[in-house]
């Protein structure tokens, strides 16, 4: 690859869909998705601040299915609290909130606190059923 095929820096300029697909049976390269997500959040925050007075012209929505299987995104607890003002949002999709706690430890509660809404589709976590 001799040139940038992803053009991540154009996200937020126009409507675009980017699909990051990983194996659900082999986690060898999950760290690549985690690094890419981290870089993407940072790139778009910087772009919003530097080029668009703090807000991207086109809202960027991250649909993070199987979020626990991506691995830990560095500083995600801080990012999730600040991206909203820059016209970005993240939908974190988990099988159970315990997965989030296993990966993010104490920061899991901060991540949950910064979620505007929670959709619970059933499960056996009795403690979360009372939310």
Question: What does each model-identified segment do?
Answer:
Residues 1-88, 103:
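P-loop NTPase motor domains
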């Amino acid at each position: 690859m001799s040139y940038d095929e992803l053009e991540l820096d154009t996200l937020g300029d126009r409507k675009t869909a980017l699909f990051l697909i990983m194996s659900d049976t082999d986690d060898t390269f999950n760290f690549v998705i985690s690094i890419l997500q981290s870089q993407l959040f940072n790139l778009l925050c910087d772009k919003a601040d530097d080029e668009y007075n703090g807000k991207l012209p086109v809202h960027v929505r991250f649909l993070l299915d199987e979020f626990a299987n991506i691995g830990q995104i560095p500083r995600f607890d801080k990012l999730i609290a600040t991206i909203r003002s820059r016209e970005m949002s993240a939908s974190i999709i988990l099988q159970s909130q315990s997965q989030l706690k296993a990966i993010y430890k104490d920061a899991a509660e901060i991540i949950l606190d910064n979620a505007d809404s929670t959709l619970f589709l059933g499960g056996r976590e009795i403690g979360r059923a009372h939310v």
